């Protein structure tokens, strides 16, 4: 909480409650920036996004910086703008190989545990507003804070993944149609694979769907597929976050 106050100002009580309930975890809080959060950190905005990841390697790295007198790490996402997000160290290397310098390091902590990006919550107003859906759902936010979590579309705050077209592979993504020979297919495991269709993923749970989605989309490009058919999951919560990513990936 001390680091929160270092980067952010006018922190509402419900933001502190969310931090206590869901950090470390896949949640980013957007807060009014403090004077120490300079433009090169905030992208020139009057807000700053704060997150405490749950991965033990990430936490260990942050603790090393704090032990040396720091207050955290300022860093962008490890992917090119608009492209499919990497969920493994190999995917990061594939994505950024031409930009990496000899002194650059990639920390390999295995595949991402959730798969889709963190929930982003705007905490600059009287109630929380969800700017990007993720594993921390609006219902979970409401149960934590006692406040109704609104969903913003669009927002005056620029956030990653808010454009209509995003998370897009080179292949064309088509939603909820019948796959034909030569297409790639991402669908729940109970859906059979038609003859000649390349099965990219067959998740059995919504959590597995989120974990394998981006890897499957990247695999389509690696195999040179032109079309990927994806059957969207139904339901609320994490399923809604997956549908959000799929609808953006199919909008190019």
Language-model-derived ranges and their functions:
Residues 1-252:
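Active-site-adjacent structural elements in enzyme catalytic cores
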């Amino acid at each position: 909480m001390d680091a929160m106050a270092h980067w952010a100002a006018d922190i509402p009580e419900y933001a502190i409650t969310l931090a206590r309930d869901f950090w470390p975890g896949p949640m980013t809080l957007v807060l009014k920036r403090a004077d120490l959060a300079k433009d090169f950190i905030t992208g020139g905005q009057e807000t700053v996004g704060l997150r405490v990841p749950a991965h033990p390697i990430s936490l260990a790295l942050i603790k090393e910086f704090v032990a040396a007198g720091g207050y955290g790490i300022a860093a962008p996402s490890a992917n090119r703008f608009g492209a499919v997000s990497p969920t493994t160290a190999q995917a990061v290397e594939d994505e950024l190989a031409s930009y990496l310098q000899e002194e650059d390091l990639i920390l390999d902590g295995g595949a991402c545990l959730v798969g889709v990006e963190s929930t982003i919550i705007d905490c600059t107003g009287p109630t929380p507003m969800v700017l990007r859906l993720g594993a921390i759902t609006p219902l979970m936010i409401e149960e934590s804070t006692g406040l109704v979590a609104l969903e913003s579309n669009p927002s005056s705050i620029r956030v990653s993944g808010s454009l209509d077209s995003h998370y897009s592979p080179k292949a064309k993504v088509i939603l909820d149609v019948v796959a034909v020979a030569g297409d790639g297919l991402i669908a729940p495991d109970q859906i059979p694979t038609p003859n000649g269709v390349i099965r990219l993923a067959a998740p059995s749970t919504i959590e597995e769907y989120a974990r394998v989605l981006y890897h499957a989309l990247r695999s389509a490009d690696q195999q040179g597929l032109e079309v990927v058919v994806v059957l969207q999951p139904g339901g609320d919560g994490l399923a809604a976050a997956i549908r959000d990513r799929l609808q953006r990936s199919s909008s190019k």
